Amino acid sequence: MASVGYQARRDEIETYFDRTAADAWAALTSDAPVSRIRRTVRRGRDAMRDTLLNWLPADLTGSTLIDAGCGTGTLAIEAAQRGAEVVAVDLSPTLVNLARERLRDLNQTLDVTFIVGDMRDMDLGSFDYAVAMDSLIHYDVADGVQTLEAMAQQIHRKMVFTFAPKTPLLALMHATGRLFPRADRAPSIEPVSPERLARHLKEAGLTQEWLVGRSHRIDVGFYKSHAMELTRK
């Protein structure tokens, strides 16, 4: 069962990405001109997406994949172009609709289903692979690990995901963000060190069935995120 904290943060994220930041997110994930700061975020996200996809087989034909927190669908579409049958889920109806439009505009025959919903939803089905790029970073470490636990029950081979690394800059941004009125601020990120995350994964029992694999940090301007790989033993 989702905690009260998880549900409250989920609602906050949905409101922010579906209303407050939908236009900005649409621009960020396109080729549209953006500010210098957002250009660094775009480059960082591109590098992270490449990292996560490179941790999966180059040929995904015959494989199933869930993109948990798909946003505007860039990663889901790239996975489908490599042959995967993809289910992509996001809390924001606005971003999901944009993802569907971008898929149609490609005019390619790709097996992607975009769904509005919660990545913890057990009714989404079972998959060979799960990708959660920057979709856990707004939850505290306990809720993030519980989300991985829920997803793990449905995943046969591998999960790749990101978390916000605990750095002095991110800690300062996290503290400063809380000074703004709630209506004016984005959902805060929840930085965590790799060591603390590893302890939580072990305490949750995930490491009994899953092997902690590769780990890689992307640090480009204002984009800072850390990728981790879990492979079923």
Predicted segments with their positions:
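Short alpha-helix
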Residues: S188-L206
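Conserved beta-strand signature within the Rossmann-like core of class I S-adenosyl-L-methionine
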Residues: H156-P165
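N-terminal, positively charged/glycine-rich alpha-helical extensions of SAM-dependent methyltransferases
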Residues: M1-D31
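A conserved beta-strand element that flanks and buttresses the S-adenosyl-L-methionine
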Residues: V131
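A short, conserved alpha-helix within the catalytic core of class I
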Residues: Y139-A150
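Conserved glycine-rich SAM-binding loop
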Residues: G71
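Conserved alpha-helix/loop element of class I SAM-dependent methyltransferases that forms part
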Residues: R42-T61
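Class I SAM-dependent methyltransferase SAM/SAH-binding core
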Residues: I66, T74-V116
